[in-house]
């Protein structure tokens, strides 16, 4: 009857609250990293388990953490969880240059699709206010390690992109071709000149028009950038150093797909290997 159902619900509620007390140290850990380090709930749970921060019986799984948020048992709200918000399914056609800019992604080595080798990057540009002469963010993401490099570029021109890429490669010294083996771009006019990089031994490939899914890794990380720079916000409002710090924050997030390692620590290990050779 109704009374019995209410009793069972109250009993279940008491059990939940008792469990929260049992795992209170773990929940403090979750809230701290969520608020201070911008970790997702899954990253908090997975990293704690992977590093044996707490005994397993003193933790709860990701699904339970989301349930706690729904029930008001954590000082977080669903609106604080960007990965839980419904994404718009409206498709936008990118204004891309239909002229063939270089080699098609169909010519890219099939091994790149496997994500087993380091050094294969996707590149994109992220706009602030869509106006002429406005700075943009040049966004690069490595396919295997999911590490991102975000650079403030003075404008959306091919010349500005070329200049920023040259500075980036210079920062890696004579090993830059081992760090950047291939780069995959779309047919945007800002990438009109990057095929010239093939003269230095870097493979440059272009996706088919209107198929952003062919560089889905960088597209996904662009959404993470929007946590810091919302659409319509002028990139002039941010310094180059601030934008690099945003990348550092994202690269410091433990990832389930990386065994709850961070892209930063795996990238550093890869660079150590390259420069030690």
For each feature predicted by the language model, list its residue ranges.
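Short, basic alpha-helical/linker "hinge" immediately adjacent to a nucleic-acid-recognition surface
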Residues: 1-36, 42, 47
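Basic, flexible linker segments flanking DNA-binding modules
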Residues: 9-10, 54-114
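Mobile genetic element proteins and their domesticated derivatives, centered on retroelements
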Residues: 30, 44, 65, 124, ...
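C-terminal domain-tail junction helix/linker
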Residues: 112, 231-277
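Short conserved beta-strand segments at catalytic cores or DNA/RNA-binding microdomains
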Residues: 113, 126-127, 132-149
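Active-site beta-loop-alpha junctions of metal-dependent nucleic acid enzymes
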Residues: 129, 133, 150-175
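RNase H-like two-metal-ion nuclease catalytic core shared by retroviral integrases
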Residues: 185-187, 192-197, 206-229, 236-248
């Amino acid at each position: 009857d109704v009374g019995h159902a209410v009793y069972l619900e109250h009993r279940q509620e008491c059990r939940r609250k008792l469990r929260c007390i049992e795992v209170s140290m773990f929940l403090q850990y979750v809230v701290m990293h969520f608020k201070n380090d911008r970790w997702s709930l899954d990253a908090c749970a997975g990293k704690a388990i992977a590093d044996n921060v707490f005994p397993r019986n003193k933790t709860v799984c990701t699904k339970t953490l989301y349930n706690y948020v729904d029930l008001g048992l954590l000082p977080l709200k669903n609106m604080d969880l960007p990965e839980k918000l419904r994404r718009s399914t409206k498709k936008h056609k990118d204004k891309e240059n239909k002229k063939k800019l270089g080699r098609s992604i169909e010519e890219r080595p099939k091994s790149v699709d496997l994500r087993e080798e380091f050094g294969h990057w996707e590149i994109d540009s992220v706009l602030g206010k869509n106006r002429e002469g406005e700075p943009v963010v040049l966004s690069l993401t490595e396919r295997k390690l999911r590490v991102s490099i975000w650079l403030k570029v003075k404008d959306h021109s091919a010349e500005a992109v070329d200049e920023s890429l040259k500075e980036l490669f210079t920062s890696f010294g004579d090993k830059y071709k081992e760090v950047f083996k291939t780069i995959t771009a779309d047919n945007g006019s800002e990438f009109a000149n990057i095929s010239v990089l093939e003269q230095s031994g870097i493979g440059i490939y272009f996706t088919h028009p209107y198929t952003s899914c062919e560089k889905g890794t960088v597209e996904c990380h662009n959404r993470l950038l929007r946590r810091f720079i919302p659409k319509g916000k002028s990139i002039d409002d941010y310094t180059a150093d601030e934008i690099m710090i945003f990348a550092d924050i994202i690269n410091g997030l433990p990832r389930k797909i990386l065994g709850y390692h961070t892209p930063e620590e795996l990238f550093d290990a890869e660079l150590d290997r390259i420069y030690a050779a």
